[in-house]
From Swiss-Prot:
Keywords: Antibiotic, Antimicrobial, Disulfide bond, Fungicide, Secreted, Signal, Toxin. This is Opiscorpine-2. GO terms for molecular function: toxin activity. Belongs to the long chain scorpion toxin family. Class 3 subfamily. Expressed by the venom gland. Residues 55-95 form the BetaSPN-type CS-alpha/beta domain. GO terms for biological process: defense response to bacterium; defense response to fungus; killing of cells of another organism. InterPro entries: Long_scorpion_toxin_alpha/beta, Scorpion_toxin-like_sf. One of its GO terms (cellular component) is extracellular region. Residues 1-19 form the signal peptide. Pfam families: Scorpion_toxin_alpha-beta. Has antimicrobial activity against yeasts and bacteria. It is found in: Secreted.
Amino acid sequence: MNNKLTALIFHGLLAIASCKWLNEKSIQNKIDEKIGKNFLGGMAKAVVHKLAKNEFMCMANMDPTGSCETHCQKASGEKGYCHGTKCKCGVPLSY
């Protein structure tokens, strides 16, 4: 039960962070308070950092919101491809 509650709180903080209501530093401080400065806390902070710098919402080579494609069409007229969590215009995945 406690693990599920922790996961729920963590996902809630990620959702709030993606809406720009809170910044990355405040979420990482909350992780330090709730989880602590241990291995699990470090992993959680790394995930928050990776998602916070994700500008076009690319996740695992997928563009669920279409933000990458829209950005590339406006910027260069090329097709947008997600490479992990990064958006690249006109550069398809090679694997």
